[in-house]
Regions:
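Iron-associated oxidoreductase/ferritin-like identity signal
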Residues: 1-166
Length: 166
């Protein structure tokens, strides 16, 4: 079983992924409310990815003899006025999860917890793909804004990008 501090940090990662899923669903609802179907669908897919990451950590902890714990959380704040703010919020959240996961990998390496480190490396690779997609989407949104496109037009361009990448 991993050290108590690693168990605590793994539980924090579970809850971080859970929050991110909740955030993506909340932002997806905002997009749907503004008839931004492509972005809404993408964010629902991202929410599912985050739940999958959460469950992977949960299952790893159980298999390693730890006791996973999912806490409660307040609803995320969504005060977005446009797609750029919305996708910046998702990217900021990704960076927070990425940094947390990187710190956890370092702690596992320092503790010589090889199984934990190996597991976290595979999880990190999955998250890196998500991060690259979010960066590409945000760049596409900024490009659409510079071109003077409205949110619905930008959303259609995003849908084409997302379909190419998935």
């Amino acid at each position: 079983m991993p050290a108590a501090s690693l168990i605590q940090r793994l539980n924090a990662q579970i809850n971080r992924e859970f929050y991110s899923s909740h955030l993506c669903l909340h932002l997806s609802a905002w997009c749907a409310q503004h008839s931004l179907t492509g972005s809404a669908n993408f964010l629902r897919s991202q929410a599912q990815n985050n739940v999958t990451h959460m469950m992977r950590v949960f299952n790893f902890m159980k298999q390693s003899g730890g006791m996973p714990s999912v806490g409660t959380m307040p609803p995320p704040k969504c005060e977005c006025l446009n797609l750029e703010e919305l996708f910046q919020q998702t990217l900021d959240d990704y960076y927070l999860r990425h940094d947390t996961l990187s710190g956890l990998k370092e702690e596992a390496r320092a503790a010589n917890a090889v199984k934990v480190e190996s597991f976290l490396l595979s999880l990190s690779k999955e998250q890196d793909r998500d991060g690259k997609m979010l960066v590409a989407i945000l760049e596409q949104v900024k490009e659409a804004k510079r071109a003077g496109l409205c949110m619905n037009q930008a959303d259609r361009k995003l849908l084409a990008l997302i379909e190419r990448c998935h």
